[in-house]
């Protein structure tokens, strides 16, 4: 889960009309929010009662500059005993500059830094060491008006990981992108179809840790009903391979993941907004048993 991507989307959506309406009056726009997410695989004890994922964020925008700060945490939790397994803390900083910002074309560039502070635990719940890994990011984004009804938009991120990779199992490099077309049917309904790619690889030829590849078609159908926006969506897997079990089995394993979800968003028209989201995913694996996956999230955001 990328906390800053979700929060940045809210800022950009709220900021486009504001920038156009007050192009000559520069001022600060702030945005603060929090989210709680859970993820769970049916019938497995490895993740206990599921993954516990709280996050908070803060964004500040001045003219073409946007500064973003976030703190995210992830790890399995057992709510009956209130105990946790291995988890990590993930503070993050990003700075975006908008080079072009018109209704016809928007182009921006983001640089970012993220730290992963891992806290390992053994099978008995006792502390079992730690790791401290960093991720550096550069990401262009764009939004192009093709016609009154069609737009082409997306982003492309390049990541470099450093330190303690042998402990965390990560590859040293990664690319991630989501890009596609939006068709605006009317003021209420639009349709978006995107291509998504995420790939982890190693620039160091002596390593094969944590390499993977994911390709998906992602489709969204936002329905705007006044202050309420409902967005049913799906993710259709095209190709998915991984070797996350790199310590015992470096061979790549194939997967087939497909997801259906619904995002509910409500704008209170006073700067406050909230989201509710649920998704169900079918996860089929070449090796081992297939899984059924549930995701749920609730978020609140205040813009001022």
Model segments located where?
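Outer-membrane beta-barrel architecture
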Residues: 55-59, 94-96, 139-141, 178-182, ...
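Detector for outer-membrane/organellar transmembrane beta-barrel domains
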Residues: 142-244
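Outer-membrane beta-barrel "beta-signal"
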Residues: 223, 266, 278-280, 290-304
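Cleavable N-terminal export/targeting peptides
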Residues: 1-33, 66, 103-105, 303-304
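Transmembrane beta-barrel strands of outer-membrane/channel proteins
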Residues: 32-38, 60, 69-73, 109-115, ...
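Repeated loop/turn-to-beta-strand initiation elements of outer-membrane beta-barrel proteins
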Residues: 63-69, 102-109, 146-154, 186-193, ...
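Short glycine/proline- and aromatic-enriched beta-strand/turn motifs that initiate or cap beta-hairpins
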Residues: 21-81, 295
């Amino acid at each position: 889960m990328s906390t800053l991507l979700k929060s940045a989307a809210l800022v950009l959506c709220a900021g486009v009309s504001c920038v156009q309406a007050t192009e000559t009056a520069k001022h600060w726009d702030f945005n603060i929010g929090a989210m709680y997410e859970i993820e769970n695989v049916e019938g497995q004890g490895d993740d206990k009662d599921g993954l516990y994922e709280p996050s908070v964020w803060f964004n500040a925008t001045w003219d073409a500059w946007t500064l973003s700060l976030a703190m995210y945490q992830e790890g399995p939790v057992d709510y009956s005993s209130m105990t946790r397994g291995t988890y990590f803390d993930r503070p993050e900083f990003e700075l975006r500059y908008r080079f072009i910002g018109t209704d016809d074309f928007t182009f921006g560039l983001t640089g970012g830094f993220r730290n992963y502070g891992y806290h390992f635990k053994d099978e008995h719940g006792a502390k079992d060491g730690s790791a401290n890994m960093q991720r550096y990011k550069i990401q262009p984004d764009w939004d192009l008006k093709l016609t009154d009804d069609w737009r082409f938009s997306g982003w492309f991120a390049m990541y470099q990981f450093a330190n303690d990779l042998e402990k965390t199992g990560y590859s040293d490099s990664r690319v991630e992108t989501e890009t596609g077309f939006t068709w605006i049917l009317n003021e209420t309904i639009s349709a978006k179809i995107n291509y998504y790619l995420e790939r982890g690889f190693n620039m160091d030829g002596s390593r094969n840790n944590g390499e993977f590849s994911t390709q998906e078609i992602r489709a969204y159908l936002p329905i705007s009903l006044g202050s309420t926006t409902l967005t049913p969506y799906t993710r259709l897997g095209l190709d998915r391979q991984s070797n996350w079990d790199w310590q015992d089995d470096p061979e790549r394993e194939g997967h087939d993941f497909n997801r259906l979800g619904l995002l509910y968003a409500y704008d209170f028209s006073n700067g406050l907004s909230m989201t509710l989201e649920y998704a169900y995913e079918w996860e089929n694996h070449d090796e081992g048993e297939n899984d059924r996956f549930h995701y749920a999230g609730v978020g609140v955001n205040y813009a001022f």
